């Protein structure tokens, strides 16, 4: 998910998306530990999506526009 796509969401939608991504990351970590996750690069992608969402929420909180 690109930052430009994320910026189109409202704050409430971003908070919901953040919770979904955190749950997805937790599930992926369990799958990885059990040896069921084939594409481990997905964990990295989800972590980065979470970081992007949190960054955009923080920018909005501080009133920073990009």
From Swiss-Prot:
Keywords of the record: Ribonucleoprotein, Ribosomal protein
Matches recorded under SUPFAM superfamilies: Ribosomal protein L29 (L29p) (SSF46561)
One GO term describing the cellular component: cytosolic large ribosomal subunit
UniProt keyword annotation of Chloroplast present: no
GO molecular function: structural constituent of ribosome
CDD domains given in the database record: Ribosomal_L29_HIP
Keyword ATP-binding: no
One GO BP: translation
Stored InterPro entries: Ribosomal_protein_uL29 (IPR050063), Ribosomal_uL29 (IPR001854), Ribosomal_uL29_CS (IPR018254), Ribosomal_uL29_sf (IPR036049)
Record-stated family: Belongs to the universal ribosomal protein uL29 family.
Name recorded for this polypeptide: Large ribosomal subunit protein uL29
Gene that specifies this protein: rpmC
């Amino acid at each position: 998910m690109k930052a430009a796509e994320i910026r189109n969401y409202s704050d409430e939608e971003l908070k919901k998306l953040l919770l979904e991504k955190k749950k997805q990351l937790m599930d992926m970590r369990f799958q990885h530990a059990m040896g069921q996750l084939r594409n481990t690069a997905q964990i990295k992608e989800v972590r980065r999506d979470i970081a992007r969402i949190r960054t955009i929420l923080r920018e909005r909180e501080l009133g920073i526009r990009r």
